[in-house]
Amino acid sequence: MSDITSTAKSAHASKMVLIVDDDPFSLELFSEMLMSLGVTDIHTASNGRVGLRTLTDLPRQPNCLICDVFMPDMDGIEFLEALTKNGYQGGIILVSGQDISMMAIAQEVAVADGLKMIGAYTKPVPIAVLAEALASLD
């Protein structure tokens, strides 16, 4: 086990993370990466609307949301605006495998709305980058 994952495991054990992404492969990959970092309370949603329903069903707010910018039905920007209206207080990691400029716009929207941006990354996100982003929540 690498130093990154062995150190991170105990630090992230109590964190809850919600992953919102329309790509099943990305949902699985992020889930596996989070588990390898010690996060065990992981929830997934296939788009922003499902993500909002999941948030209301959870017993508490997740410490972190990992959100794809480009999704059908409700994209990442609409999802971020809804998070603001719902008073979400946790950290947000934006991810995209597509246009970086849209991710920058989404990040600006989140910051302007008072959301706690942890970072914005292109897919695939290296596990060391994800570990560092989660560590910034502490």
Residue ranges and their predicted role:
Residues 1-18, 31, 116, 126-138:
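Non-catalytic signal-transmission and effector/linker regions of two-component phosphorelay proteins
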Residues 21, 68:
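Active-site residues of response regulator receiver
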Residues 22, 44-53, 76:
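Helix N-cap/capping motif at the beta->alpha junctions
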Residues 24-43:
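Two-component/phosphorelay signaling modules centered on CheY-like receiver
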Residues 59-66, 93:
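Active-site beta3 strand of CheY-like receiver
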Residues 71:
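Receiver (REC) domain active-site loop signature in two-component systems and cognate sites
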Residues 78, 85, 89, 98-120:
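Alpha4 helix (beta4-alpha4-beta5 surface) of REC/receiver domains from two-component response regulators
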Residues 123:
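A Lys-centered signature of the CheY-like receiver
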